[in-house]
């Protein structure tokens, strides 16, 4: 296995159509639509990019996938019923800015009834409250927990974990910003560079990202100071935008 190897877009699309024909031969009328997503769907694939496809099935509760490599290239094909796919497209979790971009750049390969457009419209029309709730959950479930971790490091170490924790905090901050602006990042590789270009960032976020993007993660004191500044910035930012986190006096149940 010496891959991935360099391939052209034309070579990838030839494989896509081969897979499409295989799907139609095997599943026949059970197939409603087939599309390509990811960099290949956006037409921004690089020489080593993989192939990602989705298949809308008429079978109720269909939900499975195939992921494989030939040793030279890799493919992932997700098979979902229309109901399951629409339900997922309408969900908003903390990682929505990274997971749901697939629904905004689907390249149809086979679509007998406009199903992929329906998926796109569903993802596009998610109600604002879901984003609000996801932001509040992200602050409690991830960022608050991370704050405890870096404060523990300040007191008792180990500082060896601080660089990777800083990267995690920067990524969580990017999800916060993406949810607030309701944008999906192009790729995981471009999350931070795209996040810092957004308007109305929490104070301290841009400075924190500069450490991560430059790889300057060896000075523990500077990292801890930057993390605290960002955490303070989040407090002011959430209050300004009305993201009220429920705080229980003791035990809420």
Swiss-Prot record:
EC class name: transferase
Reactions catalysed, semicolon-separated, are:
kanamycin A + ATP = 4'-adenylylkanamycin A + diphosphate; amikacin + ATP = 4'-adenylylamikacin + diphosphate; neomycin B + ATP = 4'-adenylylneomycin B + diphosphate; paromomycin + ATP = 4'-adenylylparomomycin + diphosphate
Per the record's keyword annotation, is Chaperone included, yes or no?
A: no
Q: Which domain of life is it from?
A: Bacteria
InterPro entries according to UniProt: KNTase_C, NT_sf
Q: Its Gene Ontology molecular function terms?
A: nucleotidyltransferase activity
Name of the protein described by the UniProt record: Aminoglycoside nucleotidyltransferase (4')
* Taxonomic source organism: Bacillus sp
């Amino acid at each position: 296995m010496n891959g991935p190897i360099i391939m052209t877009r034309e070579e990838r699309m030839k494989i896509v159509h081969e897979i499409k024909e295989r799907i139609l031969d095997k599943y026949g009328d059970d197939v409603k639509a087939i599309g390509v997503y990811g960099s290949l769907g956006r037409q921004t694939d690089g020489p080593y990019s993989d192939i990602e496809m989705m298949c809308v099935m008429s079978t109720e509760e269909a939900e499975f996938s195939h992921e494989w490599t030939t040793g030279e290239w890799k493919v992932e094909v997700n098979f979902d019923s229309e109901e399951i796919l629409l339900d997922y497209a309408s969900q908003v979790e903390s990682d929505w800015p990274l997971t749901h971009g697939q629904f905004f750049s689907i390249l149809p390969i086979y679509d007998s009834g406009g199903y992929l457009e329906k998926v796109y419209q569903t993802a596009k029309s998610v109600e604002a409250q879901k984003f609000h709730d996801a932001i509040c959950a992200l602050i409690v479930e991830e960022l608050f927990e991370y704050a405890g971790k870096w404060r523990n490091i300040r007191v008792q170490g180990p500082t060896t974990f601080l660089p990777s924790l800083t990267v995690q905090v920067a990524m969580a901050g990017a999800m916060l910003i993406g949810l607030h602006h309701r944008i999906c990042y192009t790729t995981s590789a471009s999350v931070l560079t795209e996040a810092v270009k957004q308007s109305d960032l929490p104070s301290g976020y841009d400075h924190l990202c500069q450490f991560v993007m430059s790889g300057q993660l060896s000075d523990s004191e500077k990292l801890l100071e930057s993390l605290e500044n960002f955490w303070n910035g989040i407090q002011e930012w959430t209050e300004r935008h009305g993201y009220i986190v429920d705080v229980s006096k003791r035990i809420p149940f």
